[in-house]
Amino acid sequence: VNAARLRRTGAWLTVVGLTATSLGATLLVATGAASEAAERASSSVVQSVGGDSASTQAWSDPSLVGDRDPHDPDYAAFSRLEVTVSQTRNLSHQSVTVDWKGGRPTSAGQFSYDYLQIMQCWGDDSAGPTPDQCQWGAPNPGLNNLVGERTAQRGLKRGEDPQQAYDAAHLVPPPLTNPNLKAYTVPFTPVGGSPVTDVADYFTSASTNEITAARTGTDGTGTANMEIQTSLEAPHLGCGEALASGAPRSCWLVVVPRGETNANGTLAEQSPGGSVVGSPLSATAWSHRMVFPLQFAAIGSSCALGNAEQRLVGDELFSDAMTSWQSALCGTGTTYGYSQIGDDEARSQLTSTVSGASRLAVVNAPLDPAPDEPVRYAPVVQTALVIAYTIDRQYKLGSSLSERDGTALDDLVLNPRLVAKLLTQSYRADVPGGGSGKPLIDNPRSIVNDPEFIALNPELEQFVHTAGPDGLMVGLGTSDAYAQLWRWVIADPFARAFLQGEPDEYGMTVNPVYADLDLTHDPNLDSFPKADLSTYRQDDSVPAPGYGTLDLRPYTNDMADAASRTQKANAGAKIVWDVNKLPPGFTSSGAQLPGSRFSMALTDLASAQRYGLRTARLVNAAGQALAADDDTMQAAVDAMVTVDGVRVTDADTRVRGAYPLTLVDYAAVPVCSASADQRSDYATFLRYAGSTGQVPGESKGALPRGYLPLGASQRDDLTAVADLLDDPKAVAKLCPPAATATPTASPSPTPTATAAATPDPTPTSTPSAPAAAPGSQDPGSDPAPVPVPTTPSEPTSASTPAPDPDTGESTAGDPIRTGGTDVGTARLGLVGSTGLGAACAVAGPVLMRRARVQALREGELETDFS
């Protein structure tokens, strides 16, 4: 072949190749979008199991408590009141949200009039409970100065209520020192018990769930989170315990609105203190009640005795899902138990030689080092770590926002450096004695006094200067989820510089105790040290050494406990010296008071939603302040990188619209060391987890709130593991008889990112620091401008360019039919044509170059090839 022919052939192949490649790539992108749209459309039509059990009642509706008296002095105040309870069926130990509208605004400051009182009651009568069946009368002692006389109690004052009976049934047994004393109360009758006048044997201010006073705003609306207790938390109510019929006992949520008129017709302003008086259990106040029936899920296991048992272990992120699935899995003939343990311990069980060790562990990160035998990872749930909060607006005197004083704050923004400050006791209020020594004396008292926090949350600039949380509540122990939080913090250059001792632009420095820990260089950091050993005592009456960090800022038992404490606004600090205690010691001051609560905790999204908590918007590496929801978690999952068979978040990657603390939990199974029975049971479990277990809903067996259902490709991965476990031939091929494995597990690795998408044009070394301005923000839009602090001197290390989610590759799952067209088959053909075009595009220039060489040899080089 002469040079001219080679040149012509090469040119022709180049043109054909470039054309075919461009056309094929364009069509691949188009069909990829169609495939993704089909997958999203498929998932969007899934119906929730159990349906919506929210219940709304109008006070004027006579269907439950009968007709209201239009001549009642409070009729006008309550006639437009409408209350909604967010969930009334399939209840467990959780919170429900009570919202209302049409009320009159609560008096400013104290709860003098026009507020709601909420309680939980038992009662088997279909008409609802009687006052003696309600858990009421053990308020926080600090509330006595905020409400009227007896409004927080069960006690009655003779003659105060014309409709109330003052008889022997309501008489309090007189003390021996005054046998003629006549005092009255509404007794409490526990389920299955006799009436008592002293409730202390059944509930106290520390255990009750009663809401003494809930504020109505100037617009007539209000909201409150009500803890719902089962028979496990409140045996005296018996909610959810099995009746003789086998059905779980139902209970009631009762709302008693308080107006501006006392039971005897006098106005509240004429009472001592200008407040409405009298117990909500007295006859007149009780006649104003609204009752909501509550249906509970059965308490305890419903699996039949004699079932085969399989013990599963894993982390806390999976606990809520497994609790929901367990009873539904009983029908498989196997009882699946679940032990919540640390991730490292769960991984170690997979390779343990101890009898009874589980061969299925739910973890967030793979075994490291990888064992000799094959371990398969099946995605089971995806959720997020969140910072949940209960914060009441506490405005300064004269604030322009004072009309909302005492209502719930509904937006909070935190960036990595603020979280670093909270985790390192760098605010003076988080150190015993208030950090009176150098250098902490120059730091803000609490996060509310931090200019960086105010820049992100300008509304809180009008809070009183004494407002602030009892620290950021965190759990004891280690967790892969905690490691992910630290990676998010340390990946931020401003937070990293702060932890290394650099002051922020306002002069605040890290607590030096934590600077000495060198947290930024600890690759295995997966817990929250409380390293400041300072102690404090108020005076000489308190024995040395006084109280310490663990008294002031105690750990929570786990993330669920953290959520529960946040809902109650009770961190459990024990810093009040009680000389009457035997022996004398530090005690808790109890929960924060309504209207002045400021509580924050690190927890999981499922627990936060179970307890009805708001969650902070966290600043991601792209500079956006985002809350955890289905969209932001999905964006994070789509951008995850693969590490040894699992997908994890790369904290250095800048992904727009992605919530930074999104996590995927995997069921890890060492295929060869699991027995045949175990593999079969694990396969059954995984198939349930990948099908019915991914349908969101309230019913047992559904996917609880706080979890993002698995995508199609993830369900395919899960099914592949289940199929392997159920295939003896595949197992035999994977596990030759000669193979042995006795490895040990050790802490999970720090993930190494792999190229997953087209690099983001914005360098990753640009700090995210004080991030997106508060306010609602579209995850797909650029963040609003925010104050940028002075760049720290050290943290500018280069990192790998991050993928841009707008142009990055998408992971393809199995073909999905849409509109009657097999998109997968079409894509396969396009892949082939694109590949052929690429080959032509490569071969063409090669032939042209060869023609040039041959022409040189022949002495026929033409000028257009020079």
Language-model features: locations:
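Secretory targeting and sorting signals
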Residues: 2-37, 100, 833-849
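Short helical patches
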Residues: 6-9, 857-862
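A detector of low-complexity, intrinsically disordered, Ser/Thr/Gly/Pro/Ala-rich segments
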Residues: 7, 12, 16-19, 24, ...
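Ser/Thr/Pro/Gly-rich low-complexity linker/stalk segments immediately outside membranes or between
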Residues: 32-42, 853-858
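Flexible loop/hinge segments at secondary-structure junctions
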Residues: 42-69, 73-753, 769-789, 794, ...
